[in-house]
Curated annotation (Swiss-Prot):
Catalytic reactions on record: ATP + H2O + 4 H(+)(in) = ADP + phosphate + 5 H(+)(out)
Keyword rRNA-binding: no
NCBIfam families, per database record: atpD
Free-text function comment from the UniProt entry: Produces ATP from ADP in the presence of a proton gradient across the membrane. The catalytic sites are hosted primarily by the beta subunits.
Species annotation: Mesostigma viride
Assigned EC number: 7.1.2.2
Record's subunit section: F-type ATPases have 2 components, CF(1) - the catalytic core - and CF(0) - the membrane proton channel. CF(1) has five subunits: alpha(3), beta(3), gamma(1), delta(1), epsilon(1). CF(0) has four main subunits: a(1), b(1), b'(1) and c(9-12).
Membrane topology of the entry: Peripheral membrane protein
Pfam families per UniProt: ATP-synt_ab, ATP-synt_ab_N, ATP-synt_VA_C
Cellular localization per UniProt: Plastid, Chloroplast thylakoid membrane
Protein name per Swiss-Prot or TrEMBL: ATP synthase subunit beta, chloroplastic
One GO CC term, this protein: proton-transporting ATP synthase complex
Residues at which ATP binds: G161, G162, A163, G164, V165, G166, K167, T168
Length: 481
């Protein structure tokens, strides 16, 4: 060890769960966000290496840092080394088809990653002059999304929903469709979700050839996991690790990248777990007082530049289905489109359970999507809204008490509701029906035909779980037989 490195060694003075304090020699203090490394041996004599990130300078030559892995086996007095730089992770094609942890170490058992380039996970967002401002739609092949709440290329999209309404399945379908239809690269950040789901996603991707086991570099996705069992430090930073990998594809390879974050709420939750240990006074509902800043720092780096774009799709767990909770409310401020998943639709068996009236998009404007698309979407929403208003009357008095006109609205609304469902490629295993990719033009055509009354004679079950309108007509013919 050189003389310079010797100077940068401190010692641990206190450990409180995932947070530890260390004392350094005068004038040798590490900077905020520097990575510190503790090397030790546990009781079994195995080597331990714990990486921490400096969060606070406490005075009296002490710093407070958050550990990225478990602090079991560490004790006071152990040496701690200042690396002199923030955490850096591998970037580039070498990351495709692999699973990394927050430190950029592969955790898939396929050997080490020898990266030509590493990037620090903390960096500034692009400057104003680097940003690209042109508006264009990102077609997903999912009817309800493309028609009613279209995604913006280089935008941020929130997937809102409680537990078990299908957020992760929708994300898997999007990765699949984007890889097949756009040939784009995706980066998936698993932030504080179930390890089983992470494993299922990986296996699913291998089966659908999104990850190519024979030739990993031709894979379409890099995975970064910091799951529920990880300490809060890892869950707080794993989103930045995934974002750093996505930024390289955008800035250096000039690609359009999809960044999935599942789940952005867990990023906030991890921040709130360490906030109190860092000595900060809690804010509303016990969240960290720095909530807006932490969210803004992450979100402002996700954007389109002159080089390429990062389109981000973020699953947002809504605690107790309360959209006014500070975590989802802070996330809302950054989004271009919201896809809200509804428990009522899931209970009816309509998948994807996207709520057509609650989901919104800033892209649904006639001068962006065109008059035909805008007009069809508005008519679909009006029909569904009228049906919603009539539901109380139907529940109390029955359908027969409605006027002829309202009965027609209800019949068409029920067809629209069913036609908004769609078989997914990634759900073929469960449903047995092959997945369908529906182009935007086909979606508009189908809904226009229903609204114009051209299909009033068909039974409503013909519209359930089909792709385009031709399939619904064919299904109606087989139902008659």
């Amino acid at each position: 060890m050189t003389a310079i490195e010797t100077k940068r060694i401190g010692s641990i003075t206190q450990i409180i769960g995932p947070v530890l304090d260390a004392k350094f020699p005068p004038g040798q203090m590490p900077n905020i966000y520097n990575a510190l490394i503790v090397k030790a041996k546990n009781e079994a004599g195995e080597d331990l290496s714990v990486t921490c990130e400096v969060q606070q300078l406490l005075g009296d030559n002490q710093v407070r840092a958050v550990a990225m892995s478990a602090t079991d086996g560490l004790m006071r007095g152990l040496e701690i080394l200042d690396t002199g730089a923030p955490l850096s992770v591998p970037v580039g094609e070498i990351t495709l088809g692999r699973i990394f942890n927050v430190l950029g170490e592969p955790v898939d058992g396929l050997g080490d990653v020898v990266a030509k380039t590493k990037s620090p996970i903390h960096r500034n967002s692009p400057t104003f002059i680097e940003l690209d401002t042109k508006l264009s739609i990102f077609e997903t092949g999912i009817k309800v999304v493309d028609l009613l709440a279209p995604y913006r290329r280089g935008g941020k999209i929130g997937l809102f929903g409680g537990a078990g309404v299908g957020k992760t399945v929708l994300i898997m379908e999007l990765i699949n469709n984007i890889a097949k239809a756009h040939g784009g690269v995706s980066v998936f950040g698993g932030v504080g979700e179930r390890t089983r789901e992470g494993n299922d996603l990986y296996m699913e991707m291998k089966e659908s050839k999104v990850i190519n086991e024979e030739n990993l570099s031709s894979s379409k996705v890099a995975l970064v996991y910091g799951q529920m069992n990880e300490p809060p430090g890892a869950r707080m930073r794993v989103g930045l690790t995934a974002l750093t990998m996505a930024e390289y594809f955008r800035d250096v390879n000039n690609q359009d990248v999809l960044l999935f974050i599942d789940n952005i709420f867990r990023f906030v939750q991890a921040g709130s777990e360490v906030s109190a240990l860092l000595g900060r006074m809690p804010s509303a509902v016990g969240y960290q007082p720095t909530l807006s800043r932490e969210m803004g720092t992450l979100q402002e780096r996700i954007t389109s530049t002159k080089q390429g774009s990062i389109t981000s799709i973020q699953a947002v767990y809504v605690p107790a289905d309360d959209l006014t909770d500070p975590a989802p409310a802070t996330t809302f401020a950054h989004l271009d489109a919201t896809t809200v998943l509804s428990r009522n639709l899931a209970a009816k068996g309509i998948y994807p359970a996207v709520d057509p009236l609650d989901s919104t998009s800033t892209m649904l404007q006639p001068w962006i999507v065109g008059e035909e698309h805008y007009g069809t979407a508005q008519r679909v929403k009006q029909t569904l809204q009228r049906y919603k208003e009539l539901q109380d009357i139907i529940a109390i008095l029955g359908l027969d008490e409605l006027s002829e006109e309202d009965r027609l609205v209800v019949a068409r609304a029920r067809k629209i509701e069913r036609f908004l469902s769609q078989p997914f490629f990634v759900a073929e295993v469960f449903t047995g029906s092959p997945g369908k990719y529906v182009s935007l033009a086909d979606s508009i055509k189908g809904f226009t035909m229903i609204l114009n009354g051209e299909l009033d004679s068909l039974p409503e079950q013909a519209f359930y779980l089909v792709g385009n309108i031709e399939e619904a007509i064919a299904k109606a013919a087989t139902l008659k037989e």
